[in-house]
A protein has these predicted regions:
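N-terminal small/polar loop signature for handling phosphorylated ligands or for N-terminal nucleophile
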Residues: 43-115, 123-124, 228-239
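A glycine/threonine-rich phosphate-anchoring loop and its flanking beta-alpha core
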Residues: 110-207, 298-305
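N-terminal amphipathic/basic leader segments beginning at the initiator methionine
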Residues: 1-29
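Active-site segments that bind and position negatively charged phosphate/pyrophosphate groups
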Residues: 201-328
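Glycine-rich phosphate/diphosphate-binding loops that line cofactor/substrate pockets in enzymes
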Residues: 19-35, 53-58, 86-87
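Conserved beta-strand elements of the Class I
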Residues: 35-36, 91-93, 133
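C-terminal charged capping/lid subdomain of soluble metabolic enzymes
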Residues: 166, 299, 309-395
């Protein structure tokens, strides 16, 4: 067995009663007033009013910031940090999906000097952020459990990350009831993000017995409940499975990184403003197929967890069956299978930049050395082109 380390400091609270969960979180942190950050989409939903009502009923003071953008930029995040510094809030609550939670984490600027660009990379944050409570309203990004902030840099037109233990949420509040009546597209998009975290971590070279155990349980919950939850958004058991699966899958990603689905996806999503889950839905089958031979034992195990009859199959055949099943799940969820339909074009210059990002992410940062098969620049460009055109994976 190889040496490994496992990092987890976030306190997870699973509570189907939002008011009760918030009261517990406030008591643990000993705080009085929160800046709550969300995006206009969530602010238009009934759960936003439920959140404010719950805060009032427990006498938890708050200010609101409702201007979070999807795929938040450095500009938006710094505006949020400035808004926080202008208040007397002693804690921050991120309420929403990964964008709201990452923007809430960017409150680090309230206790650290300079701009976000000063902290790109790992372990550059010097001071602890204000206490944070992350209340997720989607089951996908798992941003509430990571030490990372994903940022679209407006100058570089690519996604950057800040990584630091100081960026870990103090409390992650998981309330499945908040997922009720989630739009089908949001649920499918977020769920595929969780699936990609799980699978890329499981087959990665940094995987260890702890992350493997989590991954198998997460994979079981997602393949059992994602499609059901998309089709039956009021199913509280399916919602519980998915909110936990997303949370747990990111425990994997935050410890051992992801793979080339994320490495290529960060370049495409940041450059063309496509949601992270959708980007991964298009890319993941291609990346799994690229790795199928070196990752055959683990992908074969995934096939069995999915209920695929692997009797009489070789390990490689079972692994290939798993890849095809993941592709079929993507299609059953009615997620996009190509980038071309977004009206985007990929030029030779774009392909070089995609290869630059993927190559860099394979060498630097949380996912460095994690991909099971070492890809070349030409491999990355070929995967991007196949994904752009929606080439169907086959064996």
């Amino acid at each position: 067995m190889n040496n490994f380390s496992y990092f987890s400091t976030v306190r997870t609270m699973f509570n189907n009663d939002l008011k009760e969960g918030l009261a517990q979180a406030r008591k643990v942190l000993g705080v009085k007033k929160a800046m709550i950050l969300t995006d206009p989409g969530v602010a238009a939903l009934p759960i936003w009013q439920e959140m404010q009502q719950a805060m009032k009923e427990i006498d938890f003071g708050f200010e609101l910031f409702e201007q979070v953008k999807p795929n938040p930029t450095d500009v938006t995040m710094e505006q949020a940090a400035d808004a926080l510094k202008a208040t007397d809030c002693d804690c921050v609550i991120g309420f929403g999906g990964g964008s709201a939670i990452d923007t809430a984490k960017a409150a680090l600027l309230a206790t650290n000097p300079g701009s976000l660009r000063d902290y790109y990379g790992m372990n550059k944050v010097q001071n602890k952020c204000l206490p944070t409570i992350m209340v997720t309203t989607t089951a996908g990004s798992g941003a509430e459990v990571t030490q990372y902030i994903s940022i679209v840099d407006t100058q570089q037109q690519t996604k950057q990350q800040i990584g630091s233990p100081f960026c870990v949420s103090d409390i992650a509040l998981l309330c499945p009831a908040l997922l009720k009546n989630s739009p089908r597209s949001v649920t499918a998009d977020a769920g595929f993000d969780a699936l990609a975290h799980c699978m890329e971590g499981f087959i990665g070279r940094k995987a260890n017995p702890i992350t493997d155990a989590i991954a198998i349980q997460v994979f079981r919950m997602i393949t059992k409940s994602l499609l059901k939850f998309v089709n039956e958004p009021n199913d509280i058991d399916a919602a519980s499975d998915m909110i936990l699966a997303a949370h747990m899958s990111t425990m994997i990603a935050s410890n051992i990184g992801t793979g080339d689905g994320h490495n290529i996806g960060l370049a495409i999503g940041g450059r063309f403003n496509i949601s992270h889950g959708t980007t991964l839905a298009v890319l993941l089958p291609h990346v799994l197929a690229f790795n199928v031979e070196v990752a055959a034992p683990k992908l074969a195990e995934c096939a069995r967890v999915m209920g695929i009859d692997t009797d009489g199959m070789t390990e490689l055949q079972a692994a290939q069956a798993c890849v095809l099943a993941v592709q079929q799940l993507r299609d059953d969820l009615h997620l996009p299978n190509n980038f071309k339909d977004f009206g985007m074009t990929i030029t030779d210059e774009d392909l070089e930049k995609i290869a630059d990002t993927a190559e860099y992410k394979n060498k630097v940062g949380a996912s460095a050395g994690s991909a099971p098969r070492k890809g070349t620049r030409e491999d990355f460009k070929r995967i991007a082109v196949d994904a752009y055109h929606g080439v169907k994976v086959s064996f």
